[in-house]
């Protein structure tokens, strides 16, 4: 059975991937974002209009990568990216999306506009390093996601959730969760329809060290697998 990680374990594994196994951030981000886009296609292939909400960190980078691949898969993604970073990696990811004619919104639509204009929301705002409370600049988007009737797909962690203890009062309730590397403890509280595992890049020795039991879940060349 796949093991669920504490917040500190997730941080430690990430650091080992970078420092011991010499993965680069953009390597892992590309693999993670690709696996997310494939999982989304598997569950929502009949939809077209997708809004990808990106935060300022690695989770947001995963969202930008996913948006690019979703475009290639025939979807019509738009991106809401309220707090951009000046790091070259994120600037390049943004440039790639713009070069593929992916629209970037200046403001988050209200819940009614969201229902009229989009069929799926990809939540790539906060990752496993998140600690409450939500910062003021993200309160508006979190309120909209909480009220929206459009199904939400959360990447790794449903934004605003405690990484180990799950959903706060009035938190978002995603229809889909894509856990990356390995599920975090909050995934035990996920009650949506689809739970996928993505990010197939963990070396066997690292998997054994943390007793993750993840690589056996995958088959063939799949880079994501349904857990629920």
From Swiss-Prot:
It is an enzyme of class 5 (isomerase). K(+) binds at residues 59, 123, 159. One of its GO terms (cellular component) is mitochondrion. InterPro entries: YjeF_N_dom, YjeF_N_dom_sf, YJEFN_prot_NAXE-like. Its EC number is 5.1.99.6. Binds 1 potassium ion per subunit. (6S)-NADPHX binds at residues 58-62, 127-133, 156. GO terms for molecular function: metal ion binding; NAD(P)HX epimerase activity; nucleotide binding. Pfam families: YjeF_N. Its cofactor is K(+). Residues 10-214 form the YjeF N-terminal domain. NCBIfam families: yjeF_nterm. Catalyzes the epimerization of the S- and R-forms of NAD(P)HX, a damaged form of NAD(P)H that is a result of enzymatic or heat-dependent hydration. This is a prerequisite for the S-specific NAD(P)H-hydrate dehydratase to allow the repair of both epimers of NAD(P)HX. This is NAD(P)H-hydrate epimerase.
């Amino acid at each position: 059975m796949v093991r669920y990680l504490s917040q500190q374990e997730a941080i430690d594994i990430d650091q080992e991937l970078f420092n011991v196994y010499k993965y680069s951030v953009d390597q892992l981000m590309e693999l993670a974002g690709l696996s997310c886009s494939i999982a989304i296609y598997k569950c929502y292939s009949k939809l077209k209009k997708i809004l990808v909400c990106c935060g300022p960190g690695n989770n947001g980078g995963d969202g930008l990568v996913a948006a690019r691949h979703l475009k290639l898969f025939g979807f019509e993604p738009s991106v809401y990216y309220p707090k951009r970073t000046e790091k070259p990696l994120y600037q390049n990811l943004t440039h790639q999306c713009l070069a593929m004619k992916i629209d970037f919104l200046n403001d988050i639509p209200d819940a009614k506009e969201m229902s009229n204009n989009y069929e799926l929301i990809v939540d790539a705002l906060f990752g496993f390093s998140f600690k409450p409370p939500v910062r003021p600049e993200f309160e508006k988007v979190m309120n909209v996601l909480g009220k929206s009737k459009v199904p939400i797909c959360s990447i790794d962690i449903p934004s605003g959730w405690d990484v180990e203890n799950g959903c706060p009062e009035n938190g978002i309730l995603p229809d889909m969760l894509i856990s990356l590397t390995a599920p975090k403890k909050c995934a035990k509280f996920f009650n949506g329809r689809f739970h996928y595992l993505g990010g197939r890049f963990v070396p066997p020795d690292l998997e054994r060290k943390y007793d993750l039991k993840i690589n056996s879940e995958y088959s063939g060349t799949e880079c994501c697998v349904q857990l629920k």
